[in-house]
């Protein structure tokens, strides 16, 4: 048999019901809960109509736990109301699930079933010691009920129960119930007054903002001209309301902003990207051409001090047909040497698969006056005997002409000398089989240790 039981049975609706129940507890006619119920007792104790009252200091219960799943609290007057939600739906038939039970994601997203059970709580701090008025004790009330019981009237309130008619709540208890804040059991009237003063201050602030001159002017303009829609941006306010800086500073900022609106001069225009310009010949300076990229120190530029006005087309030197780049280019008037850099990777290649790019010559430049002697490797090589190569000192005096009429002297070829054949000398048999030494063969003559011939 359980030694724990509900304090009373019924339904708590308002403060009058609270006063009757607490007065019965203070008089000793109703019994408080002295300990926390066990897990086996919770199922039988949590039933609609049961009302529990316990003293926090004497029972040691800081928080009431009954093992049920409840929703977040809702404020109802001075009470906190909770709804029971059963995750597995014990009051309904469970549907079949193909998902295993260990699937946490599926279990976390299951629907909660409202069972209809409600829990209403209330807390009160009351002085039970007449000798010490500062000593307060905390009393908690827990009541269970269902909506069906309320609509059907199966649960009676303490004010409707004849058993509670003999209890007369004291004025001290009624004052303590009046001081309880809404939604909790903490009585702090000073904080409530402070909250009220804060609300009044905020209301006065909003009233003062609405009565500002700019807002009143806007409303008066709207009343005089009903067709216009009141817009706050149309109000003209002095410049000092936005910024306290002097007027000269604003004028200077205005002038700086106007400079960005001026048209750009032709000489101050920035160059366009490089891909928007047509490519120019490499190594030739054109004064009318404006490249998209700026020339740096590492990028050489070929130019002449004087220019020839004759409309002369560029001509290619004879060596250009063979893909040989000139080493020096001379100007037409000053004959000053200008270094030439050929960047074309295919200029030194030959063959039908390579498109020859001729060395660019400016129209103001003359062809080179000096030809470069280049060995023509297209001439047939002299046939030599691989077994007996010719001597190195022998030089051929034959000269050949290339297609341009230039005499070409073949370069001397370094031929390796003939290998010298050496005769193999075999060692005598005595070297192959050295004599053996023994103890009897020892002597002081050093010649005796020599090999026998």
Curated annotation (Swiss-Prot):
Membrane-spanning segments: none
Compositional bias segments (type: Polar residues): 433-453
One GO location term (cellular component): nucleus
Stretches for region Disordered: 183-210, 428-453
Stretches with biased composition (Basic residues): 198-207
Molecular function in Gene Ontology: DNA binding
InterPro entries, alphabetized: Gti1/Pac2
GO biological process, one term: positive regulation of transcription by RNA polymerase II
Protein name, entry field: Uncharacterized protein YHR177W
